[in-house]
Swiss-Prot record:
Deletion phenotype: A double rsbW-sigF disruption shows no effect in the presence or absence of rifampicin.
Swiss-Prot/TrEMBL keywords: ATP-binding, Hydrolase, Nucleotide-binding, Transcription, Transcription regulation
Protein name, per record: Anti-sigma-F factor RsbW
Disordered: annotated segments: 1-31
Complex and partners: Homodimer. Interacts with cognate RNA polymerase sigma factor SigF with a possible 2:1 RbsW:SigF stoichiometry; this inhibits the interaction of SigF with the RNA polymerase catalytic core. Interacts with anti-sigma-F factor antagonist RsfA with a possible 2:1 RbsW:RsfA stoichiometry; this blocks binding to SigF, thus indirectly activating transcription. Interacts with GTPase Obg.
GO biological process: negative regulation of DNA-templated transcription
Domain of life: Bacteria
Keyword rRNA-binding: no
UniProt GO molecular function: ATP binding; hydrolase activity; nucleotide binding; sigma factor antagonist activity
Function (record text): A cognate anti-sigma factor for alternative sigma factor SigF. Alternative sigma factors are held in an inactive form by an anti-sigma factor. Binds ATP and GTP, may hydrolyze both.
Amino acids binding ATP: 124-128
Stretches with biased composition (Polar residues): 7-16
Family stated for the protein in its record: Belongs to the anti-sigma-factor family.
Amino acid sequence: MTDQLEDQTQGGSTVDRSLPGGCMADSDLPTKGRQRGVRAVELNVAARLENLALLRTLVGAIGTFEDLDFDAVADLRLAVDEVCTRLIRSALPDATLRLVVDPRKDEVVVEASAACDTHDVVAPGSFSWHVLTALADDVQTFHDGRQPDVAGSVFGITLTARRAASSR
């Protein structure tokens, strides 16, 4: 069974809801027509606050390895902390939080998603939205098009940090 993924900024793609925890397959990522890079890293963890340090560390390590400047790495870590905290607080019990860090030539794209009981995890105009747009060069949200219910609905946030040489 597939549902339509509603990308709030870019049309949509399909999501295979039969995957465990309602996770999306690689081909279902809202990459705006781009394929995931060969250096992309995906980490799936229980949607619990105890896992925030691990997620921040992963993003910080990849950002540093990718030669983002110190401030850009710090901003990206803070943005990921905010995104993941919001997702964890809205996640269904026993949900899995999925984090994908995709280094590209001119940017690092981070996508976080989880099965949530609401689509109002991060709403444009909210305090969290302002924090995220101050920390990342681009912020987008997406969900799988289903209304949140007992089974939840996949909600995600994509952050983009551009390299200093490419107009940061």
